[in-house]
């Protein structure tokens, strides 16, 4: 929710802070920049217990969103978004390892997809809820909601996630050894281009639907629920298929489907 909620409330934030929608888009970029800077933090914490890392990262997310909810101006909100983005990549990386290790034999891909489904469920329920809160109350209530949900998640991690053995430490340089092969670069490139293309339009989905497509402000919530539903279904299906077929085949089929739908 912390990542995607800004897309639905962008016009409300821009109006309240007295800035244009393109300038308000910097808050999305700040989060993404935090993700880029935060992911390498795993290199420094690679010897720490995985559960401890998850707790620290979740606490950092809570701080960032509480800061965003109380931001009096553009710069403080920009800082809050950056801080809340710092744990994003590292959190999903560690959580994927934990999910894979806790899964039954042959079910690791499905387990990871269920964990990642939290991000798609956020699009199904969290983002529309944030949009509705901003429309009826205030955009600040949305970030307060994310912070409160983070506190609940923090408790559940502490209470229910067992201590899991991490991956074998190969040293600082060993973390980059896989980049000597071309396959990781192709995956990184495809991910960058794919996500970049999605965020080019999804970041401004609210003003595009209202100002360009002519939808009313009240219709944004159900439209975003529909988009989120598609993400949830696609994520769950791909997780099951990845345990049966090679990732290359699943990825190729998914990209082909996207191209067909765009046509």
Q: How does the language model describe each region?
A:
Residues 80-118:
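Cytoplasmic helix-loop-helix junction between adjacent transmembrane helices
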Residues 52-67, 249-263:
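Structural signature of the two symmetry-related core transmembrane helices
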Residues 18, 70-76, 214, 246:
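Helix-breaking motifs and short loop linkers at transmembrane-helix boundaries and internal kinks
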Residues 1-24, 39, 201-206:
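Extracytoplasmic
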Residues 38-50, 234-246:
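Helix-to-loop junctions at the C-terminal end of transmembrane segments
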Residues 185-225:
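Extracytoplasmic gate region of multi-pass secondary transporters
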Residues 74-76, 105-106, 110-159, 204, ...:
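Helix-loop-helix hairpin linking two adjacent transmembrane segments in secondary transporters
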Residues 64-67, 75-84:
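Paired small-residue
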């Amino acid at each position: 929710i912390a990542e995607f909620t800004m897309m639905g409330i962008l016009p409300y934030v821009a109006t309240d802070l007295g800035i244009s929608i393109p300038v308000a888009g910097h808050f999305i970029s700040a989060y993404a920049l935090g993700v880029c800077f935060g992911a390498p933090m795993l290199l420094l914490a690679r010897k720490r217990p995985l559960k401890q890392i998850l707790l620290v990262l979740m606490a950092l997310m809570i701080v960032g969103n509480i800061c965003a909810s109380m931001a009096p101006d553009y710069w403080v909100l920009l800082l809050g978004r950056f801080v809340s983005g710092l744990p994003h990549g590292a959190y999903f990386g560690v959580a994927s390892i934990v999910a894979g290790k806790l899964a039954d034999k042959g079910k690791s891909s499905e387990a990871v997809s269920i964990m990642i489904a939290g991000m798609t469920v956020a699009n199904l329920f969290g983002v529309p809820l944030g949009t509705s809160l901003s429309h009826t109350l205030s955009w600040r209530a949305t970030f307060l909601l994310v912070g409160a949900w983070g506190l609940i998640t923090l408790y559940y991690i502490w209470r229910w996630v067992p201590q899991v053995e991490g991956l074998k430490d190969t040293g600082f340089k060993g973390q980059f050894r896989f980049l000597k092969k071309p396959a990781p670069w192709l995956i990184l490139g495809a991910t960058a281009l794919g996500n970049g293309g999605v965020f080019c339009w999804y970041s401004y989905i609210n003003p595009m639907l209202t100002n360009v497509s002519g939808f009313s402000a009240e219709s944004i919530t159900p439209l975003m629920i529909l988009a989120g539903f598609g993400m949830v279904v696609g994520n769950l299906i791909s997780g099951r298929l990845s345990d049966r077929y090679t990732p290359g085949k699943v990825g190729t089929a998914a990209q082909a489907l996207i191209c067909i739908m765009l046509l």
